[in-house]
């Protein structure tokens, strides 16, 4: 049975990926299934969602030697030239959703309601030892 490590600690995301991969015969593990010492600190310092997903996937593959699926996602607000973008989770500091929403609303002050458009972007990367990444 092929195995895949999903680079997430989010139980909801883990359920979603299991629903996709398990019916196709994959054994799915997530970061929740690993010992804490198996999960390296990962600095997602890329300049794009895809680059951050690749950084995360490679870091985990190098430690676990497993096939890894990683994603990076965020909110891209058109009136803010795509911000918060790759900085969505830490837009106002360290993973503070309330502060992030407050900062976003402050940044949108004066922007008419019909110009407050946005999209949620996700980039997914799969890496396998000795193979080129799939982006």
Describe the role of every protein-language-model region:
Residues 2-5, 11-31, 35-135:
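Anionic-ligand binding patches
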């Amino acid at each position: 049975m092929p195995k895949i490590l999903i680079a997430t600690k989010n139980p909801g995301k883990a359920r979603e990926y299991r629903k996709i991969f398990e019916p196709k015969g994959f054994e799915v593990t997530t970061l929740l299934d690993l010992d804490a010492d198996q999960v390296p600190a990962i600095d997602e310092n890329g300049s794009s969602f895809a680059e951050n997903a690749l950084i995360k996937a490679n870091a985990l593959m190098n430690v676990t030697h497993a096939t890894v699926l990683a994603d990076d996602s965020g909110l891209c607000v058109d009136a803010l030239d795509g911000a918060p973008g790759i900085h969505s989770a830490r837009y106002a500091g360290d993973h503070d959703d309330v502060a992030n929403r407050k900062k976003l609303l402050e940044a949108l002050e004066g922007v008419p309601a019909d110009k407050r458009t946005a999209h949620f972007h996700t980039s997914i990367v799969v890496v396998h030892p000795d193979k080129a990444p799939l982006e």
